[in-house]
């Protein structure tokens, strides 16, 4: 069966985004050109320009591509809301892909690139805020269930959890001996104890 033009377009965009993620992971957010993305994806060097027009637009689309699944996966739908849900999901994610996957390395390369690119910084700030909101929602659900104290500052706790997760991954890039799964488990045990009613 012949694919529709829309199906071909979606496949092309998906391959271009995968190529961009790989290049960002290998070279950083500013270390590649649109033409290299086309070449890496097996297309003409001009195709990324046709799809995304500018490198900034491509980076914005890459962030959306990388983060779409990660926002949904902040908590585990099969675990109780709150800390245990995050422990289950984050622990599985770290055990499965660690911080060495192209996707994870690209995400952190984008954070580092945002230090030097104000437009990318705005995009990454929006992603961080969406992540904090997702964590805060999970904590609110845990409060409603009676698993977490109701007098906590949910936004502050959500920020702290995100900072720990992001910071520990950054440190792991420079010291691969770190066992992030165990460190995360220990930290979340302390947080759960501190927040319990």
Positions of PLM-derived features:
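N-terminal intrinsically disordered/low-complexity leader segments
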Residues: 1-11
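Helix-turn-helix
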Residues: 15, 19-57, 61
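Short amphipathic alpha-helical elements of helix-turn-helix/winged-helix folds
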Residues: 19-23, 134, 164
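Hydrophobic alpha-helical connector segments
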Residues: 61, 72-104, 154-161, 184
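Short, basic, alpha-helical segments at the C-terminal edge of helix-turn-helix-like DNA-binding modules
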Residues: 64-70
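Amphipathic alpha-helical segments used for helix-helix packing
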Residues: 85, 98-122
